[in-house]
Amino acid sequence: MPLGVPSVPYRLPGSQYERWIDIYTRLSQERIIFLGQEVTDGLANRIVAFLLYLDSEDPGKPIYLYINSPGGSVTAGMAIYDTMQYIKSDVITICVGLAASMGAFLLASGTPGKRLALPHARIMIHQPMGGTGRRQATDIQIEANEILRIRQQLNEILAHKTGQTIEKIQKDTDRDYYMSAEEAQAYGLIDKVIEDRTI
């Protein structure tokens, strides 16, 4: 039996009455966003909206982005990335479980010094992927050129965020490159491995 979105009790400030709200709404009230699935356009739009709202509500308070994602759409992920860089609030990224592909890119894109992972988290980087299907050769060539351009752009950002050379990033992302939390810290994808909530 599938598990739906859990509801939790919530008491409005100054009220004695509780009401039930979904867990993600409750977390957002604590400035917590949970990226726990594939990055799609719809999910990216919701995360961007949350980031913009929370930043406008109190730009001096940090926003916590928990990540357990296999990755997903590059364009959707770049919308989240650009918004993270645009807003005034610090975005503290925390890997729980797996941050792969675009999930790892977003993890590394948190506020410097505030990119974290739990001890048993796994992080994986690789090059962007695209499909060809049954199409004309010129269309395939156009898509291949765009994927190569995006790959270069992502690699340049990762090199900047991690302190690695562009050549090392290109080599390491040529195939799936898995890291433990400690290895990701040494690589520069995160700043610290945490065991308790001291952030």
Curated annotation (Swiss-Prot):
Keyword set, alphabetical order: Cytoplasm, Hydrolase, Protease, Serine protease
Q: Chief localization class?
A: cytoplasm
| SS bond list | none
> Which residues does UniProt mark as catalytic?
101 (nucleophile), 126
Q: What class of enzyme is it?
A: hydrolase
CDD domains recorded:
S14_ClpP_2
State the GO CC annotations.
Answer: cytoplasm; endopeptidase Clp complex
**SUPFAM superfamilies linked to this entry:** ClpP/crotonase
Which reaction is catalysed here? Answer: Hydrolysis of proteins to small peptides in the presence of ATP and magnesium. alpha-casein is the usual test substrate. In the absence of ATP, only oligopeptides shorter than five residues are hydrolyzed (such as succinyl-Leu-Tyr-|-NHMec, and Leu-Tyr-Leu-|-Tyr-Trp, in which cleavage of the -Tyr-|-Leu- and -Tyr-|-Trp bonds also occurs)
- List the InterPro entries: ClpP, ClpP/crotonase-like_dom_sf, ClpP/TepA, ClpP_His_AS, ClpP_Ser_AS
Entry's Gene Ontology molecular function annotations: ATP-dependent peptidase activity; ATPase binding; serine-type endopeptidase activity
* E.C. number: 3.4.21.92
One of the protein's GO biological processes: protein quality control for misfolded or incompletely synthesized proteins
Pfam families recorded for this chain? CLP_protease
As for subcellular location, the record says: Cytoplasm
Q: Which NCBIfam families does this entry report, sorted A to Z?
A: PRK00277.1, PRK12553.1
Q: Which family does it belong to?
A: Belongs to the peptidase S14 family.
**Subunit structure of this entry?**
Fourteen ClpP subunits assemble into 2 heptameric rings which stack back to back to give a disk-like structure with a central cavity, resembling the structure of eukaryotic proteasomes.
What this protein is reported to do is described as:
Cleaves peptides in various proteins in a process that requires ATP hydrolysis. Has a chymotrypsin-like activity. Plays a major role in the degradation of misfolded proteins.
Q: What is this protein called?
A: ATP-dependent Clp protease proteolytic subunit
Per the UniProt entry, what species is this protein from, by scientific name?
A: Rippkaea orientalis (strain PCC 8801 / RF-1)
What gene is this protein translated from?
clpP
